[in-house]
Amino acid sequence: METFFLTFIGLLLFLESWKTLGFYIESRLLGYITLLGSVPLLIGLFLWEILKLEMIGYSILGIPSGTAIMLSLVLYFALWTFYFISSALTHLWSYNSRLLGFISLIIAFHSLIIFGIPWTYTEQQVTNGAAMFMSITGIVLGIISTMRFFQLAVPFRYITKMTGWFSVFGSVILLLVAQGI
C-alpha cells in the first residue's frame, strides 16, 4: 500500500514542480489535475484505515507490534492528501498560497519522524530494507516540504527555481523508491 501512496505523491509533486518552475500558464488546469489525483489518495486512505491494512495489499512493514509506525504512516499520508487537496483548491480558486507553506512545515516536521522511527525497532520487527525505504522517503519529502515552506509561507522568491528542480528530481527519486518496494 505504501507503493500506491508514494507513486501518487511522486506524480502529484512532479506535476506541481512544473508549475513552480513556471511552465504552466493556467493555474486552474493544475488545480483540476491535482484534485483528480487527490481522489485516489483520499479513497486509498479511507480503504487503508477501514480494512486495517491487511486486505488491500502488500505492506513492507508487516509487524505485529508496529502500530505506532503504521499510525505515523497513515497520518503522514493523510497530511500529504490534505496538502494536495488544499493545493488543488488554492490553484482552482486563485487563493494565496501561504497556507500551503505552513502545511508544508507541518509535513516537514512529520518527515523527521518518518525518517527516524523505523530505526527504533529491531531488525526482526522492521527489516533494514524497509527502514531504508522509509528513511529515503522521509528525507526526500522532508527536503521538498521544507523548501516549499520557505518558498510559499516566508516569501523567499529566490529559491523558487531551486524548489522546482528539487521537486522534479525528488519526485523521480520517490517514484523509483516506490517501485523498489
Predicted features along the sequence, with ranges:
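N-terminal topogenic module of multi-pass integral membrane proteins
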Residues: M1-P64, R157-K161, Q179-I181
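Long amphipathic alpha-helical segments with strong coiled-coil/leucine-zipper propensity
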Residues: I50-A88
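Long alpha-helical, hydrophobic tracts
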Residues: T3, F8, G22, M70-F77, ...
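Hydrophobic alpha-helical transmembrane segments and adjacent interfacial helices
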Residues: F14-S17, S38-G57, F84-H91, A108-T122, ...
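Membrane-proximal helix-loop-helix units in multi-pass membrane proteins
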Residues: S72-I143
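Cytoplasm-facing juxtamembrane segments at the starts of transmembrane helices
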Residues: F23-G37, L92-H110, T127-F133, F150-G170
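Residues within membrane-spanning alpha-helices of integral membrane proteins
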Residues: T3, I9-G10, G37-S38, F77, ...
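Hydrophobic alpha-helical segments, principally membrane-spanning helices and signal/leader peptides
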Residues: M1, L29, G66, L71-L73, ...
